[in-house]
A protein has these predicted regions:
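Conserved strand-turn element in the central/C-terminal portion of the radical SAM core barrel
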Residues: 24, 48, 52-56, 75-100, ...
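Catalytic cores of alpha/beta
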Residues: 29-34, 92-110, 150
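Conserved SAM/AdoMet-binding glycine-rich loop
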Residues: 1-78
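Short, well-ordered secondary-structure micro-motifs
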Residues: 29-30, 58, 95-96, 128-130, ...
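Alpha-helix N-cap and loop-to-helix initiation/capping positions
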Residues: 2, 60-68, 96-103, 137-145, ...
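Auxiliary Fe-S-binding modules of radical SAM enzymes
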Residues: 109, 115, 123-257
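A structural motif corresponding to the C-terminal end of an alpha-helix
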Residues: 10-12, 40, 75-83, 111, ...
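Conserved, mostly hydrophobic/aromatic
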Residues: 19, 47, 85, 108, ...
């Protein structure tokens, strides 16, 4: 409260004050304390729930369970705060992909945050998950498999007044964004457009996105960009015909976070 008072005194025209907040930090407050923070000007919380799966939360050593995620989100909303929940696609690997989609959607359907901010996972080699990748207990998903996970996740989200957004460069389909109540089907249609591409075009778009040649699916229709992406793909294949594109794309994603 002292920090908020100082902000208000020095910036009297401030309209939004935002803070990052762990789920277990929120639940350590009681409802009256959260409302006092809101009345003092803290009106937007960014919370990195990552997933609604207890199994995955334990795997990544997050430090709290799915019940804490749900309780914290509901507490923030009850305090009349704007709530952004950050989730990670691919954080369970191939083994827990469906679990991640289903349980994360289940939690968010209860919370009904104002924003659902979607990030594709980039696993750093020195991390614990990187160790799991090396020992074979965690299997990296291809970009297409992460998109399929996103489709499963989006399908299971209710049509609520939450804004769904792929806003970070690590995401493959940046145009998948919109209000879940009014634009959910449009977002699913964009995902289906990608999944319906011929195999070679899906790979080309994936490589082009990771090299920042393409940004939107429609960029595939631009001859100069298509040619540039094709040239780069052939260079990759000429140097390593057996390249593991799941590992290569993960390497690029983890370098961007």
């Amino acid at each position: 409260l002292r920090i908020l008072d100082a902000i208000n005194q020095n910036f009297p025209d401030m309209q939004y004050i935002t803070s990052y907040a762990r789920a277990d930090s929120i639940t350590r407050k009681n409802p009256a304390e959260l409302k006092a923070l809101r009345q003092a000007g803290l009106n937007h919380l960014y919370s990195g729930m990552e997933t609604g799966s207890d199994q995955i939360l334990k795997l990544i050593n997050k430090g709290f369970d799915a019940d804490t995620v749900v309780r914290s989100g509901c507490m923030a909303k009850d305090a009349d705060m704007i709530l952004s929940e950050f989730i990670l696609l691919g954080i369970g690997g191939k083994e827990l992909s469906e679990e991640n989609a289903a349980q994360t959607a289940k939690a968010l359907n209860i919370i009904q945050p104002d924003f659902i901010r979607v990030h594709a996972t980039g696993i750093k080699p020195e991390s614990k998950l990187g160790e799991f990748v090396r020992d074979g207990s965690f299997t990296l998903q291809s970009e297409e498999e992460i998109v399929i996970e996103q489709k499963l996740f989006l399908q299971q989200l209710h049509e609520m007044d939450s804004y769904y957004v792929n806003e970070h460069i690590v995401n493959l389909l940046l145009e998948v964004r919109g209000n879940l109540r009014t634009e959910k089907q449009e977002m699913l249609s964009t995902i289906d457009r990608f999944l319906a591409l011929p195999t070679n075009e899906k790979l080309l778009f994936t490589v082009g996105r990771r090299l920042n040649i393409f940004f939107l699916l429609d960029d595939l229709k631009k001859p100069e960009l298509h040619q540039e992406a094709e040239k780069n793909l052939q260079q990759i294949l000429s140097k390593n015909p057996d390249v593991d594109f799941a590992a290569l794309c993960n390497y690029v994603r983890q370098s961007q976070i």
